[in-house]
Structure formats: structure tokens, C-alpha cells
């Protein structure tokens, strides 16, 4: 009797393990499919940027073109080489400085509203949340930025409007609230101030959250072309995204008007230029992202659940 029970238990265990393996296999298959769908546009753009314009005109974009060429990149860097390098420099400066400023403002604001005994914390939290619900409109924002804050044709115009993202601020607040309050309480008893507590105790424990919002802000500054479009007229302050946007618009205009003097003598890469511009714009992100991916995943998960 006992042997029969053991036999039945073993069979049930084997069936459970078998079903778990099947579910795991299906799960991995779905993940692989999602990864393939996600990476396909990047690979497609990369291959398309090396495809000759004439080949694309005749055959369209393909994953395995019979001809490869650097003519699109040659055109881009030959016509806008210096401006591209200068715009890259502007984007790097704006991204580094802007990210540092935004992380500082976000972390300090989040810490203030996460302090347990701070009576005005709820008021500061609501003030930030209110800006997510309502705004003064584009015209009021533009007038305040240009006429009253002097954010016109300078690098500050590309940094200060994005000083704090409320979503990132609440993400950091959730991190801080998820930490044991006993750490802060014991530090206060020992005579430590809030600056010391924040820099020596809180920030080292919230490293994943800081890396997460740093990535968010870096992507925001690097990919932005709205602020240059609205606040920049001087081309020496153009960022890489905006100058690529203008370049693509100009090429599409010339390609749509073949009677112009320039377009009549040159075959413009009107189609492949989109692919090349995409690769130029996202190249630095693709290089950096794998090194901070683990912090990004951990930060989003923990920050969203705690608090």
C-alpha cells in the first residue's frame, strides 16, 4: 500500500515537473519572439542605411540587399560634417550637464517629501503632482521661458525646462520611503543633519533608483528636439537630433522638387537618409545601455512597488 502511494506521488511529481518545463519553454519562446520583434527595426535601419538609393528605389528595403554602399553616410558627413560634430558636442554637453542637474533636483525634492516628520511634505508632493494634471499652455510657457527667464539661444534653454520630471521624482520618493526609517532616526539621534543622512546613508542604498532616473534623464535630453525647435534660432546651439531633423526635412523637400538646381545634378538619398539618421542618433544609446541595463530593470521594479 505504501509503495503504491509513493509510486502515485512520484508520477504526480514527474507530471508537475513536465508541465513546468513546458510552461518555461513557452515563456522563453515568447520572450525570444518579443526580443526579435524589438531588435528587428534596429537591424532593418542599420542594413537600410548601407543600401544604395537607386537599389531602394527599384527594389525597396530588404534585409539582404544585393548591393551595399556608404553613399548615404558620405553624403551626410560631406554636406554637414562640421555641423554634425558640433551638434554632437552640444548634445553631449546638454545630456551630461542636464542629467546631473535633473538628478540633483529630483533627488533633493524626493528626499524632502519623503521625510517622515516634515509637515509640509504632502503640500510639496501635491504641488509637483498638480503640474502633471494642468499646465499654462504653450504660449504662456514660451513667454515665461524667453521673456522672463532668458532661455533663448543658449544652452541653458536646452537644460532648465527639463530640470525635474515628476514621474522620476515620485520614483525616487518611493525608493526613499522603502528604506527603513530606523536608519534615518538613529542618524538624527547621533546628531547627523539631513544633508549628511542623504549623502552618507540614503543615496548609497538607493543606487539602483539613481541609475534608473539617470538613464531616463539622459535619454530625454539626448532624444529631445522640441526645445531646440522652440527656443533655439542660432545654429551653433543645435543638438544632433535637431540638426538631423532639419537635414532630413531639407532632403525630402529637394527630392520632392527635382527641378531645383541642386537636385537636378545630385541623386539625393531621400529614403536611405532616414535609416542613416536613425543609426547616427541612437548609436551612443545602444553602446551605453547594455552596461546599465541591470540597474535599469532593478530600479523600475523596486521603485514602482515600494512606497
Task: Tell me what each language-model feature is.
Residues 2-3:
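Polybasic, lysine-rich low-complexity intrinsically disordered segments
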Residues 7-307:
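A hydrophobic, multi-pass inner-membrane permease signature
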Amino acid at each position: 500500500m505504501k509503495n503504491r502511494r509513493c509510486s502515485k506521488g512520484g508520477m504526480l511529481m514527474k507530471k508537475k515537473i513536465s508541465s513546468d518545463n513546458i510552461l518555461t519553454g513557452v515563456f522563453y519562446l515568447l520572450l525570444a519572439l518579443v526580443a526579435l520583434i524589438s531588435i528587428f527595426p534596429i537591424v532593418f535601419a542599420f542594413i537600410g542605411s548601407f543600401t544604395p538609393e537607386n537599389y531602394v528605389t527599384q527594389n525597396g528595403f530588404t534585409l539582404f540587399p544585393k548591393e551595399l554602399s556608404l553613399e548615404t553616410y558620405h553624403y551626410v558627413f560631406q554636406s554637414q560634417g562640421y555641423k554634425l560634430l558640433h551638434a554632437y558636442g552640444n548634445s553631449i554637453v546638454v545630456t551630461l550637464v542636464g542629467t546631473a542637474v535633473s538628478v540633483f533636483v529630483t533627488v533633493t525634492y524626493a528626499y524632502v517629501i519623503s521625510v517622515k516628520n516634515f509637515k509640509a511634505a504632502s503640500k510639496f508632493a501635491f504641488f509637483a503632482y498638480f503640474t502633471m494634471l494642468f499646465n499654462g499652455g504653450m504660449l504662456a510657457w514660451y513667454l515665461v521661458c524667453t521673456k522672463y527667464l532668458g532661455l533663448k539661444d543658449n544652452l541653458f534653454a536646452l537644460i532648465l525646462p527639463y530640470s525635474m520630471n515628476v514621474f522620476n521624482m515620485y520614483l525616487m520618493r518611493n525608493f526613499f520611503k522603502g528604506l527603513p526609517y530606523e536608519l534615518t532616526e538613529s542618524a538624527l539621534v547621533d546628531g547627523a543633519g539631513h544633508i549628511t543622512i542623504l549623502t552618507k546613508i540614503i543615496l548609497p542604498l538607493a543606487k539602483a533608483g539613481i541609475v534608473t532616473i539617470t538613464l531616463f534623464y539622459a535619454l530625454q535630453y539626448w532624444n529631445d528636439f522640441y526645445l531646440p525647435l522652440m527656443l533655439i534660432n542660432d545654429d551653433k546651439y543645435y543638438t544632433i537630433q535637431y540638426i538631423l531633423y532639419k537635414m532630413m526635412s531639407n532632403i525630402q523637400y529637394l527630392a520632392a522638387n527635382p527641378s531645383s538646381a541642386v537636385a537636378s545634378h545630385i541623386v539625393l538619398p531621400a529614403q536611405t537618409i532616414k535609416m542613416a539618421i536613425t543609426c547616427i542618433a541612437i548609436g551612443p544609446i545602444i553602446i551605453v545601455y547594455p552596461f546599465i541595463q541591470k540597474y535599469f530593470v532593478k530600479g523600475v521594479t523596486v521603485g514602482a512597488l515600494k512606497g
